[in-house]
């Protein structure tokens, strides 16, 4: 069996000694990839900022360097909010701002 580099242009020799023309030859390949967060929530419903951006409280205190502390809090209802936003909300009401179910933390952090 001949190697592809030994074959003449557009021909390959198979094990049965038959000559078969290639359908096509890849000259150059540029791969493209796409990724996205696996979440259904894009924005915090309280401050309306993107959920992966800083909340309004952290934006106001950006000079203090607290941006690593701006995390996402998920409820058992699968709604997500900035932790600072939902913490302020929970001081007055113990329910989810979107569906009025009793708020319980499902997970906390990015």
From Swiss-Prot:
Biological process per Gene Ontology, one example term: male sex determination
Chain residues that bind Zn(2+) 3: 77, 79, 96, 99
Tissues/organs with expression: Strongly expressed in the gonads of hermaphrodite animals.
CDD domains with a match to the protein in the record: mRING-H2-C3H2C2D_RBX1
Keyword terms of this UniProt record: Cell cycle, Cell division, Cytoplasm, Developmental protein, Meiosis, Metal-binding, Mitosis, Nucleus, Ubl conjugation pathway, Zinc, Zinc-finger
Binding site for Zn(2+) 1: 44, 47, 82
Gene3D superfamilies the record matches: Zinc/RING finger domain, C3HC4 (zinc finger)
Residues annotated for Zn(2+) 2 binding in this entry: 55, 58, 70, 84
ZnF locations on chain (RING-type): 44-100
Keyword check for Lyase: no
A cellular component annotation (GO) from this entry: cullin-RING ubiquitin ligase complex
UniProt cross-references to Pfam families, sorted A to Z: zf-rbx1
Pathway noted in the entry: Protein modification; protein ubiquitination
UniProt key word ATP-binding: no
Annotated GO MF terms: cullin family protein binding; ubiquitin protein ligase activity; zinc ion binding
Cell compartment(s), UniProt: Cytoplasm; Nucleus
Entry note about domains: The RING-type zinc finger domain is essential for ubiquitin ligase activity. It coordinates an additional third zinc ion.
Subunit-structure text: Part of SCF complexes, which consist of a SKP1 or a SKP1-related protein, a cullin protein, and a F-box protein. Interacts with csn-1 and csn-6.
Known role: Component of the SCF (SKP1-CUL1-F-box protein) E3 ubiquitin ligase complex, which mediates the ubiquitination and subsequent proteasomal degradation of target proteins. Through the RING-type zinc finger, seems to recruit the E2 ubiquitination enzyme to the complex and brings it into close proximity to the substrate. Essential for meiosis, mitotic chromosomal condensation and cytokinesis. Involved in histone H3 phosphorylation.
Family: Belongs to the RING-box family.
Name this polypeptide is given: RING-box protein 1
Annotated organism of origin: Caenorhabditis elegans
């Amino acid at each position: 069996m001949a190697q592809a580099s030994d074959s003449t242009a557009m021909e390959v020799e198979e094990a049965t000694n038959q000559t078969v023309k290639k359908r096509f030859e890849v000259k150059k390949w540029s791969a493209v990839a796409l990724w996205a967060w696996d979440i259904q929530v894009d924005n915090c419903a309280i401050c309306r900022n993107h959920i992966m951006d800083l909340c309004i409280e952290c934006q106001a205190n950006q000079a203090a360097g607290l941006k690593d502390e701006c995390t996402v809090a998920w409820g058992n209802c699968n709604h997500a909010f900035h932790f600072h936003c939902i913490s302020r909300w929970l001081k007055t009401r113990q329910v989810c701002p979107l569906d009025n179910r009793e708020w319980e933390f499902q997970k906390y952090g990015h």
